[in-house]
Design a protein with these regions (language model features):
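C-terminal low-complexity, Ser/Thr- and acidic/Pro-rich disordered "stalk" regions positioned immediately N-terminal
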Residues: 599-654
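Acidic-enriched catalytic cores of C-N bond-cleaving enzymes acting on peptides and small amides
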Residues: 90-93, 323-344, 362-398, 411-425
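Sec-dependent signal peptide cleavage junction
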Residues: 25-38, 657-658, 681
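An N-terminal boundary/leader segment
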Residues: 17, 29-31, 47-157, 383, ...
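A cross-kingdom C-terminal cell-surface attachment/processing module
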Residues: 642, 647-653, 658-683
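Structural helix-boundary/capping segments
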Residues: 147, 220, 271, 276-359, ...
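Gly/Ser-rich catalytic/binding loops embedded in alpha/beta enzyme cores
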Residues: 87-91, 108-277
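Short helix-loop capping/hinge segments that flank enzyme active sites or metal/cofactor-binding pockets
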Residues: 107-112, 177-203, 411-469, 482-485, ...
Length: 689
């Protein structure tokens, strides 16, 4: 009988312990899974953007009028209204107009964090399946623009009312990017009612009356155009800054520039405004900002994409920047001309790969850039690829002299610049030094000699192409840094003060001295980006991929080049890296202003905190949440740990109500359990007696 009592006591005690453990665990789950609704940023009529010396906000309303607002120290905007656009006559002048009516955000199915983490196809699939509407995506995007743009200065015009109306009317005709918000570059990608001034301060207020062919194509793919992004004057620079719009700040660190010339688009994607934004590339203008903001930047083969001729000597191509390789692949599939054929390769590992750590200009390459390449070389070798170090068969300085000659040939576009400056109350110092230099050299050139020089430069372009084609016969894929250093500070000069003064007074120089000065003024920029121009001068494809994060928390890209029409092969390599190595994309957090990254010349630690794809490819019924990083942590550990976005899986939710037990129910179960155990013990005691 005593043994029977012991067994019953043991059983009852076990049941009690298990019940208590289950109840405590349930209570803990309930406490940890309680969520608050994501706060929705109030929508505004204005998109505010800043300029270091003259903080202003500028955009175009539905009527086509320009809007600028002074940014107060607390980042709120003081806006006034005028009836018509007018030109800025002083650095601190304000210009505003009536803006579109406020449209309140109605998004309840998508949090800001989840939106920022999705790529274009994710969002299109959500629209197509009815999980969210295009209008909700558009409102979400505008809310984020209103929040992020005051510190970034990425967006220069918006069209909110029109975008919402287009989203409401959108029909599903199997478009690949159904209802996805898109921002387009303010240079060359005109939208009806948007600005079309090439970044020239004296052309401010000039409004486009039509959509460009590229914008029409993007609309055909299902995109909803939100507005235009910032760019440097005429796209000359590898940074984004102009006297008209000011600098675009880097989302990774606001003290640094986003790069150029498609810097506004890059900053918009990196900060989570839109998953895709359009760009153009005549010397690296897609790949450079992609390198400095952690994005995928494809420069297609010359003539491969619609509206471009394959047999021309144009250096410019047009293609969107993305944060995933699959978005780039889909875009290429739909933007490629029907008469063009892409090369296909079944086994990537069958392709020998070459790489270099040396600048074709003979300039310094930072340790960060070298480490990025060697990190990728090591990865490729471990994956079974054959990788060989070589020297580039091209003289980068000779190539840039030819590039300068082609730029001077554009001088005819500035024939009225002096008259236009005077008419609007500006001087030559109010345009970019390159613009003024091209104008003066062109006006003082012997046109027959200039034509001869241009033809000679084009012959050299053929030679450069043949040299690279010969290289690709042996090594189909060529690896190099996209940029030789990390993103520059916004205060870093893009031309020396001495050369700037000389350019604005170059009328007093001989033509030979002018050309020498023009070639020399590129130097500060080319030290940062000596690699990208080769693809433009040869017409061959290249892609920048974001596989490396420096010790200081700034990304730097790796560029892959290949032969003509190997564009899809390059994207397949990007996909391989994204899947097995990891990308630093998927929405990056904005680093605290007080963190000062290096300028790219320090020895970094291995990138242990990359946002590998395995961290973000979560189950459909899991929610991605951001792990906050405090300022204190940033200060103490930035030297050793890159400050990238971290992700964690939340518990699956089965609906709008919590599936966990409430604390009251847990207590009730505990009391019932104790009552049951007590009664059983008494009964056992009676039986024993």
């Amino acid at each position: 009988m005593e043994d029977q009592m012991k067994r019953k006591y043991f059983i009852l005690n076990t049941v009690t312990v298990l019940t208590l453990a289950a109840a405590m665990n349930t209570s803990s789950i309930y406490a940890n899974s309680t969520e608050t609704s994501a706060s929705v940023v109030p929508t505004t009529n204005t998109i505010v953007q800043t300029n270091d010396s003259n903080p202003t906000a500028k955009f175009v309303s539905e009527s086509g009028q320009s809007v600028i607002g002074q940014v107060k120290p607390d980042n709120s905007a003081a806006l006034t209204t005028v009836d018509t656009p007018h030109h800025i006559s002083a650095p601190d002048a304000l210009k505003t107009t009536r803006s579109s009516p406020v449209v309140e955000s109605t998004s309840t199915k998508l949090t800001e964090e989840t939106y920022k983490q999705k790529d274009g196809q994710d969002l299109a699939n959500m629209v197509r399946s009815g999980q969210v509407t295009s209008e909700e995506l558009v409102n979400m995007a505008y809310d984020i623009i209103a929040k992020e743009n005051p510190s970034l200065n990425a967006v220069i015009t918006t069209r909110r009312q029109e975008a919402i109306e287009e989203a409401r009317k959108l029909k599903d005709t199997n478009q690949p990017f159904l209802g996805v918000p898109l921002l387009v570059k303010g240079l060359g990608h005109s939208i009806k009612g948007g600005e079309t001034n090439n970044g020239l301060i004296y052309a401010d207020g000039k409004i486009s009356t039509f959509d460009s062919s590229y914008v029409k194509k993007y609309k055909d793919l299902g995109f909803i155009i939100l507005g235009q992004t910032n760019f440097p004057e005429y796209g000359w620079r590898n940074i984004t800054d102009s006297k008209l719009y000011g600098p675009t700040h880097n989302p990774w660190n606001l003290d640094h520039n986003a790069g150029g010339s498609s810097g506004g688009s890059a900053a918009a994607i990196a900060s989570g405004m839109t998953p895709i934004a359009s760009g153009s590339d005549a010397g690296g203008s897609i790949r450079i900002p992609s390198s400095w903001t952690g994005l995928v930047g494809l420069k297609p083969t010359r003539g491969l994409v619609s509206n471009e001729k394959p047999d021309s000597y144009s250096t410019a191509v047009h293609f969107p920047l993305t944060k995933s390789s699959r978005d780039a692949e889909t875009l290429l599939t739909y933007l490629k001309k029907s008469d063009q054929t892409l090369v296909s390769v079944n086994d990537l590992k069958s392709l020998p790969i070459a790489y270099t750590l040396k600048s074709p200009m003979g300039t310094e390459v930072s340790q960060d850039a070298k480490n990025a390449i060697m990190d990728n070389v090591t990865f490729l070798r471990k994956q079974g690829f054959k990788v060989t170090e070589i020297d580039l068969p091209i003289d980068g300085r000779a190539l840039m002299r030819d590039y300068s000659t082609l730029a001077i040939g554009m001088g005819g576009a500035f024939s009225t610049i002096e008259k236009d400056l005077k008419k609007h109350g500006f001087t030559k110092e109010d345009v970019d030094p390159i613009t003024w230099a091209v104008h003066v050299i062109y006006q003082n050139s012997d046109k027959a000699e200039l034509k001869k020089s241009i033809m000679e430069a084009q012959k050299h372009m053929d030679d450069y192409r043949k040299a690279m084609e010969n290289l690709h016969k042996q090594f189909p894929i060529f690896l190099s840094p996209t940029t030789a250093s990390l993103a520059p500070l916004n205060t870093d000069p893009y031309v020396t003060e001495e050369d700037k003064r000389a350019i604005y007074n170059m009328e007093n120089l001989s033509q030979e001295e002018r050309i020498a000065l023009f070639n020399r003024q590129w130097e500060p920029m080319l030290r940062r980006t000596p690699f990208t121009q080769i693809a433009n001068m040869t017409g061959l494809p290249a892609i920048s991929i974001p596989t490396y994060l420096s010790e200081s928390g700034l990304p730097i890209g790796t560029m892959l080049m290949a032969g003509a029409n190997y564009d899809m092969v390059l994207i397949k390599f990007a996909t391989f890296f994204e899947k097995y190595h990891g990308f630093n994309v998927k929405w990056q957090r904005i680093i605290d202003k007080e963190v000062k990254p290096s300028t790219g010349l320090i020895q970094p630690t291995p990138p242990l905190f990359k946002a590998h794809s395995s961290l973000v490819n979560l189950e459909e019924n899991s929610q991605v949440t951001q792990v906050s990083i405090s300022k204190k942590w940033m200060k103490s550990s930035v030297k050793n740990k890159p400050s990238v976005m971290a992700y964690q899986k939340a518990l699956p939710k089965t609906g709008d109500t919590e599936s966990s037990l409430s604390p009251a129910l847990v207590v009730t179960l505990l009391l019932a359990c104790f009552s049951f155990v007590t009664k059983r013990i008494r009964k056992v005691d009676c039986n024993v007696k």
